[in-house]
């Protein structure tokens, strides 16, 4: 009988605790566990949760990613837009009758042989690259083979159009896109993207995206990572023909954020035209009303003189924010003799401390300060396994959420999933790293439960987070644009800007 009473007593108390939980769901778990333990019922069962580092990191991101208080309402994006024809690089080279040879980089492609050598060069590194193809007829022939190839897919292309598409996925945002928009591209664009009539043209600009998977082979070559090689004969985007249309459209559209891209497309132009056009870019940006932040999205470049001009000819001081990857960051510091500029290429995963040093140098040398009339206060850096957001203190808010959101979308978009599928991604970021190599940096040990790491250096804040890398990416093109758009979407600029 006593045994029965004890069992019943325990049962009633367990039921009571359950009722408390149902009636007071907001009561902290620790309080409930203490209550359970005080009743001598043994340790409370641990709440279910993700066990893998990837699962814990994804759950931590979801808790951190919140919308900013002040949100963008109208975003204007320009000026490069095209149709991406996406297919297997190896299969296209085979269809063109090309055989595996030796890799060699070419800053401009003049022939099919140049294409094959450049593709092999970057496939061997697992690195993304973009090149201009100079011969119109040869490019047209290659583009026709690619476009009609079984399995070839047509997508919205061009940094501006891709960023516009990403923003347009948010129904509460109005998006203006200025760029060379032909019939196929117009058909592919989201209904929420408004294209001014002056941007419409009769013929599309095509870019060929040659993808390869991690471990894919071509002759003796084996790709270490999945990536893509992009090339085009794009004259409209190359001359940034839509720049003036873009700026003239802003007065009527009244955006509260402007995103500019396409400077890299000028590499196929003469030096004189590049110089002239850059000056016009600066003038156009200067015509954008004060108080509207301007984000510049960089892309793959090989012309050091053009990159140096972008840095020094008042383009950087005229923009508010930059988006770039590891190739562009290294090329930038090499072109402008910045930190670690003697490094010829990244050896595997870009060193966090080196990246941090270069970001610090850009903002210190070209960013806003008391002694410099520059608007540049933010850089969003992304590489395959981690991202860093660097900001000048006092100008931006919600950057912890912004960097996490950018990293999260890298995993979902590459895997073509709505949310992170932890079985299809892996955590490949360095488990520990130094925050600087040019000064006494801190040693950071990665914790998946606290995935965003923050550090500060002379009035500049850094937010670092790993990426959950998709093991079997469906599509790699446009990831950088999606990352930058998502980071901007969750960013908040202070009102005094």
Curated annotation (Swiss-Prot):
Q: Which SUPFAM superfamilies match?
A: Ribokinase-like
Write out the residues that bind Mg(2+).
297, 328, 481
Keyword Kinase tagged: yes
EC number(s) per entry? 2.7.1.147
Main subcellular localisation: secreted
Q: Which residues form the active site?
A: 481
Q: What keywords does the record list, in alphabetical order? A: Glycolysis, Kinase, Magnesium, Metal-binding, Secreted, Signal, Transferase
Q: Which cofactor does it need?
A: Mg(2+)
Q: Where is the ADPK domain?
A: 52-497
| Family indicated by similarity | Belongs to the ADP-dependent glucokinase family.
This protein is called what? ADP-dependent glucokinase
Q: Look up and give the organism this protein is from.
A: Homo sapiens
């Amino acid at each position: 009988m006593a045994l029965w009473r004890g069992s019943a007593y325990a049962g009633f108390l367990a039921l009571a605790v359950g009722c408390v939980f149902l009636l007071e769901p907001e009561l902290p778990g620790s309080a409930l566990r203490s209550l359970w333990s005080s009743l001598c019922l043994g340790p409370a069962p641990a709440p279910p949760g993700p066990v893998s580092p990837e699962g814990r990191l994804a759950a931590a991101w979801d808790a951190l990613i919140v919308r900013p208080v002040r949100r963008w309402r109208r975003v204007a994006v320009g000026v490069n837009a095209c149709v991406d024809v996406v297919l297997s690089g190896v299969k296209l080279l085979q269809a063109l009758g090309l055989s595996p040879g030796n890799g060699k980089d070419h800053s401009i492609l003049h022939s099919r042989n140049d294409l094959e050598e450049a593709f092999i060069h970057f496939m061997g590194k697992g690195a993304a690259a973009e090149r201009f193809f100079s011969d119109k007829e040869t490019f047209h022939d290659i583009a026709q083979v690619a476009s009609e190839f079984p399995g070839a897919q047509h997508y919205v292309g061009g940094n501006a159009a891709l960023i516009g598409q990403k923003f347009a996925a948010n129904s509460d945002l109005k998006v203006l896109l200025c760029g060379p928009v032909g019939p196929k591209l117009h058909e592919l664009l989201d209904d929420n993207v408004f294209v001014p009539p002056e941007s419409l043209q009769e013929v599309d600009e095509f870019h060929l995206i040659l993808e390869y998977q991690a471990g894919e082979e071509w002759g003796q070559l084996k790709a270490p990572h999945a990536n893509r090689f992009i090339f085009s004969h794009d004259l409209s985007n190359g001359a940034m023909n839509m720049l003036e249309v873009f700026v003239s459209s802003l007065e009527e559209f009244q955006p509260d954020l402007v995103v500019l891209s396409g400077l890299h497309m000028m590499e196929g132009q003469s030096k004189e035209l590049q110089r002239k056009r850059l000056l016009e870019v600066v003038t156009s940006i200067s015509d954008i009303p004060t108080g509207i932040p301007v984000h510049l999205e960089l892309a793959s470049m090989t012309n050091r003189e053009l990159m140096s001009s972008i840095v020094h000819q008042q383009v950087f001081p005229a923009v508010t924010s930059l988006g770039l990857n590891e190739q562009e960051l290294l090329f930038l510091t090499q072109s402008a003799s910045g930190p670690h500029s003697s490094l010829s290429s990244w050896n595997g995963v870009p060193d966090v401390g080196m990246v941090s040093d270069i970001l610090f140098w850009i903002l210190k040398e070209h960013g806003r300060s008391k002694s410099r009339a520059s608007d540049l206060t933010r850089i969003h850096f992304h590489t395959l396994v981690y991202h860093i957001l660097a900001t000048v203190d006092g100008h931006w808010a919600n950057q912890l959420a912004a960097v996490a959101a950018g990293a999260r979308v890298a995993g979902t978009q590459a895997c073509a999933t709505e949310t992170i599928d932890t079985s299809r991604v892996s955590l490949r970021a360095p488990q520990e790293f130094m925050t600087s190599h040019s000064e006494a940096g801190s040693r950071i040990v990665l914790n998946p439960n606290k995935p965003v790491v923050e550090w500060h250096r002379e009035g500049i804040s850094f937010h670092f987070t790993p990426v959950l890398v998709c093991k079997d990416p469906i599509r790699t093109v446009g990831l950088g644009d999606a990352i930058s758009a998502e980071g901007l979407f969750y960013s908040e600029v202070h009102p005094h800007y």
